[in-house]
């Protein structure tokens, strides 16, 4: 609506939107609505009370009178906090605080709730709101890809009357051309749905995730590799990919195959370590048989043993974007499994993980419990973690207890990463860990730069490592406040100051 208002300022249907996002389970009830100090009996407003008052003020404190104001609750709905909202949601439209203050909602205000489910919401609450159910498969993964392409495709060139082509300055560190975007779009359309449907029907998944999450994981790996090629290596190892589009000279024309090859191999590597990485060992064996066979001949979907996969594809109304059999110019070598190689963009080759094992001896003064014996698994995990962390993505390492996850992540944080840039903040969750304790542990390790802004020393990046993520006690209605706090940090880039109530 804000974008439409900027484009059509005279159209009264579109108004600018101001909004506040609150995860109600990342703070306590007192911090949400407000509370009396037990010693001084002084009233302190909560996060919701402050935002509600600012939006409901007449004359408006924020924006103009016709601007829309949304209070957006992004978190679990339960009987602990939602019952206090009933007076807001009924005909009174008033927020009643324990201090005795009542604030009426303005005509331009709206309350929006975005929970995962309404399993523990009371009928009194549900009857007061309009419910819109977003089915997991309704949106699909295509908008994720479209959004990624829109974020990185180069700005269109302009042509003057004399035929001179000029391209506007682009502040982004790297972009892709329209031709490269077309290759990405076609390969995703050809590979993603068959791979996801195969995993859903034929593989026992250890981690159940939505299709969109799998595609976003693929995009993040692909983006990290592209950025590594185009920015960190100054384009030298990019196999023909360039940050800015150049005139199509003969030399540039000869590089198209290399550019296509780099995109193909990067997408294959990303699919293997996202969609193909959710299964158990037996499932990986099946995916290892499927992917090369599909790349060789996509008609294997029509075989009798693939009936379940084909049925699922038909339910998705999937059609291959390729009019004829597509041939990948540099497929994953068949000497090992698809999980046995990583892609090296600098020389456009596949390199066995065995060749990337660190064979150096441990330090003589290292404690026995801290020594990690390098193998293929540590090489794979090390490369993937380095790739994601250094490109500002959040990895989640899961597995059974006692498999060495914590020890290896400590090794990555303290040995693989540049200690002059990356500053680890390590937190171990317990059953009694609260959201406020988690917030305090992180804030204490950061410098306060100005009001509402915390961060590590200038020129450095803070890496927060949460050990035993699953440990916090589950509340009566199913929420885990420390995890909700982390989700708010990842989704919105911050949290509310416990004292000032600022975001």
Question: Which residue stretches match the model-derived regions?
Answer:
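Conformational switch/transducer regions in large eukaryotic molecular machines and scaffolds
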Residues: 1-503
């Amino acid at each position: 609506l804000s974008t439409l208002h900027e484009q059509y300022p005279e159209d009264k249907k579109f108004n600018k939107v101001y909004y506040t996002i609150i995860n109600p389970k990342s703070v306590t009830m007192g911090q949400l609505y407000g509370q009396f100090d037990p010693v001084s009996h002084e009233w302190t407003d909560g996060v919701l009370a402050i935002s509600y008052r600012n939006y409901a003020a007449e004359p408006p404190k924020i924006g103009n009178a016709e601007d829309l104001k949304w209070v957006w609750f992004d978190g679990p709905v339960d009987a602990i906090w939602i019952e206090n909202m009933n007076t807001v949601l009924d005909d009174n439209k008033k927020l009643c605080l324990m201090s005795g203050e009542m604030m009426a909602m303005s005509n331009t205000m709206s309350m929006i709730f975005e929970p995962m489910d309404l399993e523990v919401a009371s009928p009194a609450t549900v009857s007061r709101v309009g419910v819109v159910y977003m089915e997991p498969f309704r949106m699909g993964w295509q908008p994720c890809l479209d959004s990624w392409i829109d974020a990185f495709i180069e700005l269109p060139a302009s042509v003057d009357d004399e035929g001179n082509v000029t391209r506007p300055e682009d502040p982004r560190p790297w972009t892709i051309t329209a031709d490269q975007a077309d290759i990405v779009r076609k390969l995703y359309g050809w590979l993603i749905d068959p791979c996801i449907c195969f995993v859903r029907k034929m593989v026992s998944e250890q981690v159940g995730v939505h299709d969109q999450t799998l595609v976003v994981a693929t995009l993040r790996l692909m983006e990290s590799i592209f950025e590594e090629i185009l920015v960190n290596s100054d384009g030298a190892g990019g196999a023909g990919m360039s940050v800015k589009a150049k005139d199509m000279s003969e030399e540039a024309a000869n590089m198209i195959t290399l550019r296509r090859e780099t995109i193909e191999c990067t997408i294959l590597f990303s699919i293997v370590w996202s969609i193909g990485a959710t299964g158990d060992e037996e499932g990986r064996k099946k995916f290892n048989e499927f992917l090369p066979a599909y790349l060789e001949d996509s008609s294997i979907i029509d075989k009798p043993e693939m009936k379940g996969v084909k049925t699922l594809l038909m339910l998705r109304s999937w059609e291959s974007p390729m009019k004829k059999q597509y041939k990948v110019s540099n497929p994953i070598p068949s000497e090992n499994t698809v999980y046995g190689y990583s892609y090296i963009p600098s020389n456009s080759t596949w390199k066995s993980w065995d060749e990337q094992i660190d064979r150096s001896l441990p330090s003589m003064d290292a404690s026995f419990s801290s020594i990690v014996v390098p193998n293929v698994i540590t090489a794979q995990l090390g490369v993937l973690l380095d790739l994601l962390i250094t490109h500002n993505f959040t990895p989640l390492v899961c597995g059974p207890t006692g498999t060495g996850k914590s020890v290896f992540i400590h090794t990555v944080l303290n040995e693989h990463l540049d200690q002059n840039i990356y500053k680890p903040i390590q937190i171990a969750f317990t059953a009694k860990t609260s959201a406020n304790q988690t917030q305090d542990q992180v804030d204490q390790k950061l410098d306060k730069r100005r009001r509402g802004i915390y961060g590590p020393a200038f020129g450095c990046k803070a890496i927060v490592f949460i050990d035993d993520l699953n440990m916090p006690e589950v509340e009566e209605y199913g929420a885990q406040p420390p995890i909700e706090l982390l989700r708010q940090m990842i989704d919105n880039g911050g949290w509310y100051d416990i004292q000032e109530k600022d975001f």
